[in-house]
Structure formats: structure tokens, C-alpha cells
Curated annotation (Swiss-Prot):
It comes from Bacillus velezensis (strain DSM 23117 / BGSC 10A6 / LMG 26770 / FZB42). HAMAP family: UPF0122. This is UPF0122 protein RBAM_015800. It comes from the Bacteria. Belongs to the UPF0122 family. InterPro entries: RNA_pol_sigma_r3/r4-like, UPF0122, UPF0122_fam_protein, WH-like_DNA-bd_sf. Might take part in the signal recognition particle (SRP) pathway. This is inferred from the conservation of its genetic proximity to ftsY/ffh. May be a regulatory protein.
Length: 110
């Protein structure tokens, strides 16, 4: 699995985990956050490796559907990019400290 996919799934899980069942949360948390293998998760829950795989794949698809409709991750990335640009622009201003403090306050609101 690519690092890019893992990072994306971690973000999607972070944004949308409240919409998942407790089993989906557990499987995704163990697989993506705790780096458990499918076999280790299957052993932990006394189910087949295939059952874990199917559950994780369905959950990944659900997370992608949520993102397609709600765009929380996309908007997060856009805000992050805008904050970076604001910081770059503020670094050339005389009121840099005030501008930087304002930007940092905005970032904390996220």
C-alpha cells in the first residue's frame, strides 16, 4: 500500500469516523493507525482474514463516498494551502508580527 493512500485514508478516517460503526472504526484504527496486519485483526476479533479485508475495503469505499459528497478533506487541503500562501505574503509586510499572529489564530480555529 502506498504512503499516499495511507495518508489519505488516515485523513478521511479522522474526518468521517463519527459516521462509521464501532466495528468499522476498530478495524480501520487497527489497520491504518496501529499498523496491524489483516491476520492480526482477524485473530483479535476471531473472524476470517477475508472478513476483515472485505470490511476494510467497504469502509474505504464509504469514506471516499463521504468525501465525494462533503469535501471536508479537500477543503482542509485548500485552507492549508491558503494559510501557507498568507504566511509567505505576510513575511514581506512591515506588520508581519500582527499578520502572523492573526494567521496562527485562524489556523487554531481549524
Amino acid at each position: 500500500m502506498s504512503l499516499e493512500k495511507t495518508t489519505r485514508m488516515n485523513y478521511l478516517f479522522d474526518f468521517y469516523q463519527s459516521l462509521l460503526t464501532s466495528k468499522q472504526k476498530s478495524y480501520m484504527s487497527l489497520y491504518y493507525l496501529d499498523d496491524f496486519s489483516l491476520g492480526e485483526i482477524a485473530e483479535e476479533y476471531d473472524v476470517s482474514r477475508q472478513a476483515v479485508y472485505d470490511n476494510i475495503k467497504r469502509t474505504e469505499a464509504m469514506l471516499e463516498q463521504y468525501e465525494e459528497k462533503l469535501l471536508l478533506f479537500k477543503k482542509f487541503q485548500e485552507r492549508k494551502e491558503m494559510f501557507t500562501k498568507l504566511k509567505e505574503l505576510a513575511s514581506g509586510l512591515q506588520e508581519e508580527e500582527k499578520m502572523t499572529a492573526l494567521i496562527e489564530a485562524l489556523e487554531k480555529l481549524d
